[in-house]
């Protein structure tokens, strides 16, 4: 099964729901950044939430999530858009702790609870929406739940999970977002709350082979879910050699000349995907000429 997400309605439109399988996407992030298990779980949870939140956007809109809880993992940064494309990184990928008292990876300890979760939506035409809430648990699912309630005034339940193999590879990853529309009946809310208390962790559901549609049925009941759209999900970075070259050109002829004399080459890495771009002295000379032409 490839990664994808579903958008759905349930209970005759009273509930909006999203569910995603992100195992391959989180695996690609782990491979690129060589994250250790606890860092993999933290980054994977953020990526999973990010791609589902991106699916709430339209057209070319995009969003950035910044999680900075003051923990040893540093900052988690995730970019996503309305097309199911997501990328992300963590400042300190080599963070791992013993399992917590529940036998799970200790994401809260890695993330920390002394900081903020920030969401910036780029809605085009210089129209930005910024929402920011304090991190309340560091487990991230609860933090995104709090974000929706506090910043967007939408009662929600967010579940995100990642299972990591002993060799650091990703066994399973996925998540869901359940949102109550205005006027949701009390009976509906009670039924959903009961199901949320009894279902297995979302990562376990993905591991057992459940599709995003089936995960929503577990959450909301069979026959209640009306799928509106399915969307492929993947790790996509928009960096390129051309963009890095443009950045070097923008330094100006003199600074490029200094690099050529001191280093003899230039190397730049993209934070989001860890791709490294190398420019030889000859290539720098060409970029210097382009910079001179611009001046």
From Swiss-Prot:
One of its GO terms (molecular function) is unfolded protein binding. Under oxidizing conditions two disulfide bonds are formed involving the reactive cysteines. Under reducing conditions zinc is bound to the reactive cysteines and the protein is inactive. One of its GO terms (biological process) is protein refolding. CDD domains: Hsp33. Keywords: Chaperone, Cytoplasm, Disulfide bond, Redox-active center, Zinc. InterPro entries: Heat_shock_Hsp33, Heat_shock_Hsp33_C, Heat_shock_Hsp33_N. Belongs to the HSP33 family. This is 33 kDa chaperonin. It comes from Geobacillus sp. (strain WCH70).
């Amino acid at each position: 099964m490839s990664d994808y997400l579903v958008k759905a309605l349930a209970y005759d439109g009273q509930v909006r729901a999203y569910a995603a399988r992100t195992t391959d996407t989180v695996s690609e992030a782990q491979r690129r950044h060589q994250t250790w298990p606890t860092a993999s779980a933290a980054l994977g949870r953020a990526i999973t939430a990010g791609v589902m939140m991106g699916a709430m956007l339209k057209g070319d809109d995009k969003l950035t999530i910044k999680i900075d809880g003051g923990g040893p993992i540093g900052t988690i940064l995730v970019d996503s858009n309305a097309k199911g494309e997501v990328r992300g990184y963590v400042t300190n990928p080599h963070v791992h702790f013993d399992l917590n008292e529940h036998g799970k990876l200790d994401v809260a300890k890695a993330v920390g609870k002394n900081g903020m979760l920030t969401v910036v939506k780029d809605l085009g035409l210089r129209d930005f929406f910024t929402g920011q809430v304090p991190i309340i648990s560091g487990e991230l699912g609860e933090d995104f739940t709090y974000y929706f309630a506090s910043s967007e005034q939408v009662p929600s339940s967010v579940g995100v999970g990642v299972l990591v193999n002993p060799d650091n590879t990703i066994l399973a990853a996925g998540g869901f977002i359940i949102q109550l529309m205005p006027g949701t009946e009390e009976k509906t809310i009670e039924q959903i709350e009961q199901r949320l208390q009894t279902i297995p962790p979302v990562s376990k559901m993905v591991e057992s082979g459940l599709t995003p549609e089936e995960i929503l049925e577990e959450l909301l009941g069979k026959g209640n879910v009306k799928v509106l759209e399915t969307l492929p999900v993947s790790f996509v970075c928009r960096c390129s050699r051309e963009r890095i070259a443009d950045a070097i050109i923008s330094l100006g002829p003199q600074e490029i000349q200094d690099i050529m004399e001191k280093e003899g080459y230039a190397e730049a890495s993209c934070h989001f995907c860890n791709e490294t771009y190398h420019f030889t002295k000859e290539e720098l000379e060409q970029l210097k000429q382009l910079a001179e032409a611009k001046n």
